[in-house]
Amino acid sequence: MDPVVVLVLCLSCCLLLSLWKQSSRKGKLPPGPTPLPFIGNILQLDKDINKSLSNLSKAYGPVFTLYFGMKPTVVLHGYDAVKETLIDLGEEFSARGRFPIAEKVSGGHGIIFTSGNRWKEMRRFALTTLRNLGMGKSDLESRVQEEACYLVEELRKTNALPCDPTFVLGCASCNVICSIIFQNRFDYTDQTLIGFLEKLNENFRILSSPWIQAYNSFPALLHYLPGSHNTIFKNFAFIKSYILEKIKEHQESFDVNNPRDFIDYFLIKMEQEKHNQPLEFTFENLKTIATDLFGAGTETTSTTLRYGLLLLLKHPEVTVKVQEEIDRVIGRHQSPHMQDRSRMPYTNAVLHEIQRYIDLVPNSLPHAVTCDVKFRNYVIPKGTTILISLSSVLSDEKEFPRPEIFDPAHFLDDSGNFKKSDYFMAFSAGKRICVGEGLARMELFLFLTTILQKFTLKPLVDPKDIDTTPLASGFGHVPPTYQLCFIPV
């Protein structure tokens, strides 16, 4: 038979199979735009996927279905739908959804991209160990305060000249997480540290590009083609190779009775669990969970700080109020402490508003349902990917009047006291809430207050001309590059 005829027949069969699969499953799922064969709804989405999700929610409601390729994804938009799934039905929606590029990197190990018993074991261990290492206690606070001092000294070296804060802020947050995982910090000129930060920053930019959205929709097709996904694989291989070296060093020197850091605690657990089945405390899980913590603990915090400084340059009246509160509560010579935060409602509100406004990760990492779930009037089959729009919660007009405006009053009551909000989901919510939330909150408060205690921020242009629009909006919101001067006070 003519090869062309065979090809046409095969494609026709695939087309019919695709249409059948979509129509057969679609009856159980929420409504949504009609998908095209093979490619689904990908052509109907803007490169700013969050804008597309917002528009689709107006047409189909807060719960709707999209197809990325031939796989359905249920989208949750708005506070009520998000709360109902993440909190009220947390267990049923707790699995990790498809994220092919991350699955390729993690290999089914670690904490971020696993599900089921492995995820529960890794998460439980990580939370316990981070507490043992001082998360939420004065021990870890002292480490962050010490790093804040190094950060100040590095900023002084700029001599009040224009500088891009990206690298120095990355060094500070990276050193904190390194002290937890490896029990060591780097000098800000260390080439290994520079390499880490360059690769993490590059990965965040690439993950927020349209190419990765396409890769995650068609991994089998695009995996073997040239493209920026290969850069992500190469960068993570570099980081994992360093972590592997550190693990080997720890294997030769750790003391079971005196664990020094996260790796030591994991090695001890490996020895304790080596006869248990299924075996979860393995070398591969250690390597990947350390990479998970390293990546998540560095890039998100440093990018939030970088975006935060840009917003403070844009809004000098806010900066002045924060510095007045610092002078009143802490003074100029005493180091900020976490206990100061309760007496600094305006600063606390500013930190929350920075995170709300920048909306760093607009959609949570994909979830999946652990079983067939009856949700509202729909039935979502086991394993279906769930996309949760955190952006829709952080920009809800009912909770945050004029959400497009940067305004710390969103988190202040009429008396000027800090006002908590259930809508603040910058760290997600429920069973998959960020493991390092406590550490991130500590770093953001101590680093930002220390910087504003010691320096005046001077923009290079008129504040009204500062553009805070993200460079890219995909996996994350990538802040624009900028320079400023740190003027010692």
From Swiss-Prot:
Induction info reads: P450 can be induced to high levels in liver and other tissues by various foreign compounds, including drugs, pesticides, and carcinogens.
Membrane topology for this entry? Peripheral membrane protein
Which keywords accompany this UniProt record? Endoplasmic reticulum, Heme, Iron, Membrane, Metal-binding, Microsome, Monooxygenase, Oxidoreductase
The broad enzyme category this protein falls into is: oxidoreductase
Query: What would be one Gene Ontology cellular-component term for the protein?
Result: intracellular membrane-bounded organelle
SUPFAM superfamilies (alphabetical): Cytochrome P450
An example of a GO molecular function for this protein is: heme binding
A Pfam family the protein falls into? p450
One GO biological process this protein is involved in is: xenobiotic metabolic process
Localization of this protein: Endoplasmic reticulum membrane; Microsome membrane
Q: Which family does it belong to?
A: Belongs to the cytochrome P450 family.
Protein name stated in the entry: Cytochrome P450 2C41
Q: Write the lineage as a comma-separated list.
A: Eukaryota, Metazoa, Chordata, Craniata, Vertebrata
Tell me what gene encodes this. CYP2C41
